[in-house]
Amino acid sequence: MSKNHEVYKDALPISLAYPLPPIILTNPLTWIPYIYRYLFRKTPRQVQWQCQLHESDLSCVVTDSEAIKKFWTSGFFGKGNLSRSEPTWHTRTKRSLGLLGFDEDLVAEEVTARRRFQRKQFKAQRAYRENRARERQLLLENGKPIPASLEEDAELPEYLTKSLKDFSRVSENPYHITSVPNVEHLQLTFPEAFFLASLGVLRINYENPNFELLPILKLFANIVANSVALTHDYSLQQSHEDPIIEPDNKFLTELAAYFYFRQQGWVVKNGTKFSVDFLLYKKGPVFSHAEFAILLIPCVGNKQKYNMQWHEVHCLNRVIAQVKKSLILCYVQCPSIEDFNKIWKNQASMNEWDWAESVLRQYLIRCVTLRRWVPSRNRD
């Protein structure tokens, strides 16, 4: 088993059972702890981590280092606020100050940067040799002598043989910093936070004590409905009354799709970088690039609030095709307003999670794969 498969072996941050100790058939002494652990197994105690709700950026913040590591290595939940994906700011900062060795505890961004540098250097060396070969051929055709610098076994210039380490000299540390506090935190989207809370591994803390009285599903839907960034109605921001929650509420449609793809075994990440709602990874960002880009299209009955024009679909599909992904149009069929209001107002008579399940069961997911037709590749 490779190192990555060992570190990221858990699909979810929950412990179902303690692993059995190793057993050697030729050594009877190893049978005793194995049999004891097998017969007297105990259910592991689930740890409930804490996070803080941030209404302004529609996210939940996790600051505990153990929780950050657990959520990332067991399902790739959230992203570092100072990193592209995995929270690696602390390691990168320590290396830039000379507190870590050049090859010590490499993170994904650094490995990627080194591979890009090696490819760039290889192409530069290849182009240099090709130019020298052409010059050598011209001299031979004109009957002129070939200088030593154009010989096939001539050494490459110094700037083409330098390694990344030569260009990555650690700058001086004028303040003699010996330790760097980790100020990075993990940001969870509302669907991720709700999913983890439903598993019982996350507790959401609120600055507003009134939020404690609301179920998480209703609270997140209210916050999204009141969001100025989504509604562009600044008067709602000042309202203290519960907003009108519609079946195609952005949080509810995203949550229904998030649960659907998580149940299919996909690792679901935010897709804002590629102008879509979600990206689907087979195992996770550490192992491979995303295979599919998901664009959510909420539908209430036979109507859609926003119909994309064909030129918009083609532009988006071309962008997705350029990054070697497949675009999936995910139609989220929402319940009718009457059916939705009937279940939504039934919250007081049900358990929080049973009520949330009854709400999500009203949503139906249909996926359509859209691929760009290329004549040179689709002749048959």
From Swiss-Prot:
Q: Organism's domain of life?
A: Eukaryota
InterPro entries tied to this protein: tRNA_endonuc-like_dom_sf, tRNA_intron_Endo_cat-like_sf, tRNA_intron_Endonuc_cat-like, tRNA_splic, tRNA_splic_SEN2
**Do you know which Pfam families this protein is assigned to?**
tRNA_int_endo (PF01974)
**Which GO CC annotations does the UniProt entry carry?**
cytoplasm; tRNA-intron endonuclease complex
Gene Ontology BP annotations: tRNA processing; tRNA-type intron splice site recognition and cleavage
Might you give the EC number(s) for this enzyme?
Answer: 4.6.1.16
The reaction(s) catalysed by this protein are: pretRNA = a 3'-half-tRNA molecule with a 5'-OH end + a 5'-half-tRNA molecule with a 2',3'-cyclic phosphate end + an intron with a 2',3'-cyclic phosphate and a 5'-hydroxyl terminus
List, from the UniProt record, the residues annotated as the active site of this protein. 281, 289, 325
Keywords carried by this UniProt record: Lyase, tRNA processing
Q: Which EC class heads this enzyme's classification?
A: lyase
Query: What molecular function terms (GO) are annotated for this protein?
Result: lyase activity; nucleic acid binding; tRNA-intron endonuclease activity
PANTHER family associated with the record = TRNA-SPLICING ENDONUCLEASE SUBUNIT SEN2
Q: Which family does it belong to?
A: Belongs to the tRNA-intron endonuclease family.
As for what it does, the entry says: Constitutes one of the two catalytic subunit of the tRNA-splicing endonuclease complex, a complex responsible for identification and cleavage of the splice sites in pre-tRNA. It cleaves pre-tRNA at the 5'- and 3'-splice sites to release the intron. The products are an intron and two tRNA half-molecules bearing 2',3'-cyclic phosphate and 5'-OH termini. There are no conserved sequences at the splice sites, but the intron is invariably located at the same site in the gene, placing the splice sites an invariant distance from the constant structural features of the tRNA body.
Quaternary structure?
Heterotetramer composed of sen2, sen15, sen34 and sen54. Interacts directly with sen54.
Question: This protein is called what?
Answer: Probable tRNA-splicing endonuclease subunit sen2
Q: Which gene encodes it?
A: sen2
